[in-house]
């Protein structure tokens, strides 16, 4: 399967000689409208005109309704995250705090919009998913170790979750931790990090520590195809 997948990589790259494509990838906004606006402004400043969204757009203690309105107006290619699904596949009484404190601020149009997200997408030869191709709530590039700390997976474990996907570049989110991994066959998997919830202080652990990136800065990625080769910049 690996040889067949590698053979197909070139077929999925832009074929025009000298073709240059730039795409911004955002993920895990979690209703943080201020962070979203800051990231959109930075993307515009860099001259990138195409944006894809990797899910988990509204759940969180910020402004879910305004975030939904802005994203709906942008009409970005968007895949479903586990927190998007959690806003419509269970009763409010069974929701976690991520969802229960925002669901009443959402309209039926907002919920219908969330329901419209596919689990995966292919855009310009790129493969998009929230977490892994098969699951919207599984860590791909790492796993949770003691005290919930993230530990990098080895390459065979990363590749095992790829299945038969032959895209040269795969974009994901979910863990809020930016990372880029190149597989032995040349495929690259990029976790964009989180726009809206890049870090939080977890007092459940002993000693307590800051999860995810350890920084309050919003994160996203810009990917570029230059002369048939994809490059990723974690911003």
Residue locations for each model-derived region?
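Core catalytic region of metal-dependent phosphoesterases/phosphodiesterases
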Residues: 14, 22-115
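Metallo-beta-lactamase
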Residues: 50, 137, 143-148, 191-204
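Active-site-proximal beta-strand elements of phosphoester/diester hydrolases
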Residues: 22-30, 125-132, 189-192
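His/acidic metal-ligating clusters that form di-metal
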Residues: 44-47, 106-181
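Active-site environment of divalent metal-dependent phosphoester hydrolases
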Residues: 30-35, 59-62, 84-89, 134-136, ...
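Acidic, His/Gly-rich catalytic cores of divalent-metal-dependent hydrolytic chemistry
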Residues: 18, 182-235
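N-terminal amphipathic/basic-hydrophobic helices that include classical n-h-c signal peptides
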Residues: 1-20
């Amino acid at each position: 399967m690996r040889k067949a997948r590698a053979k197909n990589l070139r077929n999925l790259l832009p074929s025009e000689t000298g073709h240059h494509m730039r795409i911004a990838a955002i993920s895990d906004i979690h209703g943080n409208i201020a962070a979203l606006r800051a990231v959109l402004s930075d993307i515009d400043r860099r001259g990138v005109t195409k944006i894809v969204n990797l899910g988990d757009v509204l759940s969180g203690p910020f402004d879910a309704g305004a975030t939904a309105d802005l994203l709906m107006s942008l009409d970005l290619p968007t895949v479903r995250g586990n927190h998007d699904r959690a806003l419509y596949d269970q009763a409010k009484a069974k929701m976690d705090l991520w969802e229960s404190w925002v669901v009443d601020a959402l309209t039926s149009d907002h919920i219908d919009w969330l329901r419209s997200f596919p689990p995966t997408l292919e855009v310009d030869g790129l493969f998009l998913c929230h977490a892994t191709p098969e699951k919207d709530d599984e860590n791909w590039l790492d796993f949770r170790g003691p005290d919930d700390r993230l530990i990098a997976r080895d390459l065979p474990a990363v590749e095992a979750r790829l299945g038969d996907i032959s895209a040269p570049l795969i974009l994901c989110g979910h863990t809020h931790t930016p990372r880029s991994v190149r597989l032995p066959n040349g495929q690259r998997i990029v976790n964009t990090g989180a726009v809206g919830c890049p870090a939080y202080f977890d007092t459940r652990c002993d000693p307590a520590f800051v999860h995810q990136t350890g920084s309050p800065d919003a994160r996203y990625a810009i990917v570029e195809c230059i002369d048939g080769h994809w490059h990723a910049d974690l911003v």
